[in-house]
Amino acid sequence: MEILVYIIIGIAIFILSLLVGINIGNRRMISTLATKKEELEVEIKNKQKEIEKMLKNAEEEAKALKQKELLEAKEEIHRLRQEFDSEAKQQREELKANEERLIRKEESLAKKEENLEKLKEKLEVQHENVLKLEKELETKLNEIAKMTEEEARQVVINEARDKYEREIAQKFKEIKDHYEEESKKYARWVITTAIQRYASDVTNEITTSTVALPTDDMKGRIIGREGRNIRTFEKLTGTDLIIDDTPEIVVISSFNPLRREIAKRTLEMLVADGRIHPARIEELYEKSKNEIQEYIKEVGKEAVMRVGIKQPHLEIIKLLGRLKFRTSYGQDVLEHSIEVAQFAGMMASELGLNVELAKRAALLHDLGKAVDHEVEGSHAIVGGQIAKRYGEKLEVVNAIQYHHNEVDPMTPEAVLVAASDALSASRPGARKETLENYIRRIEQLEEIAKSFRYVDKAYAIQAGRELRIIVQPDKVEDEIAEKLAHDISVQIEEKVQYPGVIKVTVIREKRSISYAS
């Protein structure tokens, strides 16, 4: 641009010089030219300023264009860098994934190699066991070759028993545990509900009764001349009359509660009457017998009313009343029967069974005990026969006869009666037994346990309500111990008579002892 300006200025000066040379003589023209020159110089200066301004604007535009292109170039570089970083990151991730995949494959191969090594060791052990078993079989075959047929048969039986005993015991335990858990939950709820809703007095066996006397002089009159009164009294009543130094008291002793009650009533009437001689004793004895028969009938009716069942035959009511004067392990049999009926009724109601049938069979379940000293047979069978004779339904008869497992049950109510009987008998304090029976039962329990194979020791504890059995730990495994406990409990049920429930516990203990010196 500067060159262009200089060219223009040069041309202008040339023209002016030409004009000056032509019109040298013409001052006016010179003056005009001078003026034109000045104007031209001013115009040149203005043009120069415009040119400078245009150059400046051009420079600014070029600078702006340069900055724009530079910014676009930077943005393009930034974009390319981002694309490069993204591709690099993706490649790094792919490399990392491939690396992890290779590591996993290496680990998998290492694990497979380890498993193969273990399998190899296991196969080697099995191979050794097979070789050992082959040697044992060879030895056994040599032994069997020398045996008789019976001896070989016994060996095979023993091997089969040892081989499958554990498997059978395990299966038995699984089934037993499953059904026990389910049944115990519901049975526990039903029995607990029945016990909570019923409570009765604890009874004890009493073999004596006392009669109060107005004065000690009455003792001599009771004895009579040469003891004839006391002999007559004891002969008629079948009791023993104990007269000692205890003031104003006479004791009547007998194991038969009915005889003892008749004797007590007879003696009380004799003392109240004051006339004591053999004829009067016989008269009042007969009167007491008649009164006690009426009392027995009333007691039977009251029992039926307490239980809340339909009236049975009159003879059955009388037999129920007689149970008032019978005891079993010290427990009043009539009160026990009422208690069993209440338990059976409540549990039948909870289970949705026939409440009337359960109560009726439960109340009559010990009916045979009223006549078991007169009729041969177990009281359960005899009781069922009596109930059948006096018109009771077959279901009631079956429940009576089943309650000691002497026949098969026909109805769920029969099983319920047996359970209620056991529940009443096992209630704490409900029953007691003589020392002789107790010792015999303890010995019998321990003998049954010791009769089983691999039993080392057996102890009956908690008054015979628990049997603890110590077995040989190297011969009996846990599963077999479970089956052993079951088998012993079955033997006890079959061979031992006992009130309540006996818990059988098998203990398998192995101790390893070492000494450091």
From Swiss-Prot:
The keyword Cell inner membrane does not apply. GO terms for biological process: mRNA catabolic process. The chain crosses the membrane at residues 2-22. Keywords: Cell membrane, Endonuclease, Hydrolase, Membrane, Nuclease, RNA-binding, Transmembrane, Transmembrane helix. It is found in: Cell membrane. The keyword Magnesium does not apply. Its main location: membrane. Residues 333-426 form the HD domain. Gene3D superfamilies: Hypothetical protein af1432 (1.10.3210.10), K Homology domain, type 1 (3.30.1370.10). It is a single-pass membrane protein. This is Ribonuclease Y. It comes from Petrotoga mobilis (strain DSM 10674 / SJ95). The lineage of its organism: Bacteria, Thermotogati, Thermotogota, Thermotogae, Petrotogales. The gene is rny.
